[in-house]
């Protein structure tokens, strides 16, 4: 429980000082709802329009511009990061439907209420993404015509393709 207390303290400090106070956030309920949404959907493609539709279905009618601003606040505080998709055949970055990962899986697990049994693959993918960044790679998500490669990693002239799987 000491570990969870520490993680909870870090989370509250980041939320209060790095996000709420720094950006003069007034809609704290939405800030929390959006972070819960991101925590629940790590490693999945997202679009601001789809998030807006989901939030509206939950009784929170928020403009996509506001969602983009709040997402940027999270990114600036290093709570989350987004990863562009890379068209492997066309060899170009795609601007839509990025993926989102947490900077710290412990913080993510705190938000969703602990490690959940069905989350192992999402959490593993998040951990691998963070490790690839620590190793100095520039990381994108590989887009194929009929699927995706979890990560396309580039460092200098080296390119590595990584697929994360819990069970094969």
Feature-to-residue mapping (PLM):
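Accessory nucleic acid-recognition modules appended to NTPase machines
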Residues: 2-159, 166
